[in-house]
């Protein structure tokens, strides 16, 4: 029997999840949101905290799985028939669009977590009908269970699609563990699909975005804002592909390689498409874009607007894309859906129909395809690929591998028998350990030498933080391993105090040289010494504040060379702001408030709210501020690891007010005398203003929290220092 729903109070959800319920964000939209720090916790993982995907993947029979995927490619289903009898084009698009959300600015997006299963990605206009691809994969995912994640399966399906059509891929690595809830990412300011208010000035795309319109992966295939201008399209392509770490050659290879296969779908009026998966009815069971045009699928399929087939053999690897690009001139036309596209002039029908073998079509191209011919830089590369198919095949194989693996981090995270032996520069390689590591006795001796070197607690802590805090949990780049703080571009970043950093490194290098010259095969890297110096300084600072503590240290980091470091690709890791050091760049554009940038940085470091809180409080009293400013250094005993920051911030003896002379600075004055006692920034004051952060701060300001504060700080510090240590068990 159905539940009664017509009573006055019946059917009302007691939680704030109803469509008309007011959430805190509705009442206070400007409130700092720190919930992003607690998303995708193990508590939301149905596989449990003990589940280890890397270990489970090792049990996978990859060859059998690939055999099943190969069979799927030609197993056309009546409910969503395969174009040309082969699903290859569909699964290439699935893998591409899973990986293609990656952006180099903050490392977010990409294929690494299977996020295409969730909103908003599962309902983006550019991902229309990829829900069908995911449903086609379900029987295979069901069969192999936890041995293969959705994230890995999406990418592998694209590889198998290519291989099943005669292309030799560069390789495949597993290791992408699924997440179980949508990531809260900033995809743009627009409130409507395909909106483009992300631009300013002369079509300047705002940071950190990578696509030209809301709901697109890269560019509008019809041209900028639907304007069929190939040269203008090339500008959009260059910008968006650069923002996902692709150069011009990789860009050409990816577009041409992907468009060697399959087709676009614009058989009829797009207004006949039903709602996307997230907006669909219960009975639609997560499938969206139900079409009212004809049968709604097969020859009547509508995904977007254009109806384009690029190749005479759309289920085989070939050079037909470039042959058609250069051998014909094109004139503007419209698809059956009314979209702008191009058709070959003076050509004979040579393109197969996807469902009727008796029919042939004229060669067609997208505006974004013609960009590869009419942009002078792209044209030169395209013509070389046209004349040298082997170079094209190699470039596409490498670019596809980079596209689908860019957010996986260092090679030690790569799993499976198809991982290439060749190490690539974009993987940020570090040398293998080829020597005996330091012992506990050595560590103690090295700490003593570091503390006797004349370097201060603040200098050592600052150097260690600068080295390790470059880590991004999004694409697993950065971190202390490799010691790249010694190299360009990091050694010259404003936030790292280049002159002072050079002094610190010089003294640590002298200690390293002396130790490594002892012989016996035992060595220590600068990367390890930087982290060890921070540990030694924290132990000293804690001891002087009255708490004895040992900061955990695991040796094994190695020193990368400048040749192993792609300077251009490391530039986006330079912080615009780092609230942990009270730093805001004076020359780079800020698109977040300082406190928002702090939370953003904490999320990239995979920190929780309490960890963020204790680290800021500790780093302030240790003197790790940029420029050695005293803003937020709320203590009369700096370089001692005390909870003074929290005690004094929350002390009602002082009243805070904006500085009358300096924007962004606040002054704390004695309520009775008016005497100036402290200064702070927005990042400092947020721990007294924001109710949840204040709750954390109150814990550390309590009289019984002195030891807890030190131990919690050390735990959070160690987490950051080891964030990129995928070689150790944690």
UniProtKB/Swiss-Prot annotation:
Catalytic-site annotation from UniProt: 97
UniProt enzyme class: oxidoreductase
Protein modification: Formation of the three residue Trp-Tyr-Met cross-link is important for the catalase, but not the peroxidase activity of the enzyme.
One annotated Gene Ontology cellular component of this protein: cytosol
Reaction equations catalysed: H2O2 + AH2 = A + 2 H2O; 2 H2O2 = O2 + 2 H2O
Tryptophyl-tyrosyl-methioninium (Trp-Tyr) (with M-244) crosslink residues: 96-218
GO BP annotations, alphabetical order: cellular response to hydrogen peroxide; hydrogen peroxide catabolic process
Keywords: Heme, Hydrogen peroxide, Iron, Metal-binding, Oxidoreductase, Peroxidase, Signal
An annotated Gene Ontology molecular function: catalase activity
InterPro entries hit by this protein: Catalase_peroxidase (IPR000763), Haem_peroxidase (IPR002016), Haem_peroxidase_sf (IPR010255), Peroxidases_AS (IPR019794), Peroxidases_heam-ligand_BS (IPR019793)
Cofactor(s) needed for function: heme b
Positions of heme b binding: 259
Signal sequence residues: 1-21
E.C. code: 1.11.1.21
Sites of the Tryptophyl-tyrosyl-methioninium (Tyr-Met) (with W-96) crosslink: 218-244
Region entry Disordered, spans: 1-24
Site (Transition state stabilizer): 93
Pfam family, one: peroxidase
Cofactor note: Binds 1 heme b (iron(II)-protoporphyrin IX) group per dimer.
Record field: compositional bias (Basic and acidic residues): 1-11
Similarity annotation: Belongs to the peroxidase family. Peroxidase/catalase subfamily.
Subunit structure: Homodimer or homotetramer.
Record function comment: Bifunctional enzyme with both catalase and broad-spectrum peroxidase activity.
Protein name, entry field: Catalase-peroxidase
The organism of origin for this protein: Rhodopseudomonas palustris (strain BisA53)
Gene that produces this protein: katG
